[in-house]
């Protein structure tokens, strides 16, 4: 519902469940309870992910992982920026950041964090993009708190960037 010029208030559960439902209706496949073990690399950069079931990891079982090839990978894992952490740990300080490393999320400052989120949505390593709170964690911006608008715009922006690159 409208709150002020350019601002809306929404029930968070209804809004996010509707987004998930509509995305699934459009063809999205959600792989629930999966963990990233590694990334796949080729000369041109990141080329996919190495995944396993979270329960396998938790139980310490020896189960071969699944590999998923991709021309572009998005780290939208939130504050933990899990995929970028794997790249930093395994490839080294080669990220598209001031010192090649994850800069670390700053303490909450909602309006500054929301503005930075859009700017920080970008390619952090060849074929690896960051969106949402992962982008602020990678580029050292403040966390945002309970604000969804920037997250949605970040998701749209990263999609547009990838579509343009893959043309």
Residue ranges and their predicted role:
Residues 1-167:
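Residues forming the flavin
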């Amino acid at each position: 519902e409208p709150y002020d010029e350019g601002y809306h208030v929404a029930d968070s559960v209804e809004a996010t469940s509707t987004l998930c439902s509509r995305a699934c209706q459009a063809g999205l496949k959600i792989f629930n309870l999966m963990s990233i073990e590694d990334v796949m690399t080729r000369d041109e950069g990141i080329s996919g992910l190495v995944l396993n079931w979270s329960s396998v990891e938790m139980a310490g079982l020896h189960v071969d992982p699944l590999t998923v090839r991709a021309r572009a990978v998005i780290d939208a894992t939130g504050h933990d920026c899990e995929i970028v952490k794997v790249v930093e740990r395994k490839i080294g300080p080669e990220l598209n950041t001031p010192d090649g490393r994850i800069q670390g999320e700053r303490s909450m400052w909602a309006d500054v964090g929301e503005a930075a989120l859009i700017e920080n949505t970008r390619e952090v390593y060849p074929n690896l993009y960051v969106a949402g709170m992962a982008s602020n964690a990678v580029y050292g911006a403040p966390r945002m708190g309970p604000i969804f608008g920037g997250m949605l715009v970040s998701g749209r922006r990263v999609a547009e960037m990838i579509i343009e690159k893959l043309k």
